[in-house]
Amino acid sequence: MTSVCFTGHRKIDSPDMYALKSLLDSTICGLVKRGVTDFYCGGALGFDTMCAHMVLYLRKRKALDIKLHLVLPCSNEEQTKNWSYNDKQEFYAIMMAADSIEYIGSEYTKDCMKQRNARLIELADCCVAYYDQSNSRSGTGPVSYTHLRAHETSQ
């Protein structure tokens, strides 16, 4: 196993933030010890952003030989069209630090997020997911879809 993707909710409650970051740190470090070198993020707000930051942080602070790859659903302008100024700046900083960027398409379509998720699963040997049972749907459909695709791919 050498590659992992991330998926999860866009909204993370503040009380969960510290514990989630700590768990993410130990999860990524554990995966690196098992041979994972490539981490794939979908570039969405919330968990994707947190994961991208953590990969970059661990690469720099702990001198880990790991790579961050972004798989984006559409062009930067389309994806960030309704984002706040601060969210856009954070996104562009992550893009500048990423090792590679792949675009599913140039324009936003009704299926581009699902196509992005399918591509993430296709590229990864394993998927790390953040699931909040009080929020069982995401902007891209049922969370179970990505879980199901990951399970099917692993068999």
Task: Show which residues each predicted segment covers.
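Glycine-rich, Arg-bearing micro-motifs that act as flexible, cationic patches
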Residues: D132-G139
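An anion/phosphate-binding loop that grips the pyrophosphate of nucleotide cofactors and donors
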Residues: A124
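Glycine-rich beta-alpha loop segments
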Residues: M1-Y92, K114
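C-terminal binding/interaction regions
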Residues: Q115, P142
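Structural beta-alpha unit
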Residues: D111-M113, L120
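Conserved small/polar residues in nucleotide/adenosyl-binding loops
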Residues: T146-T153
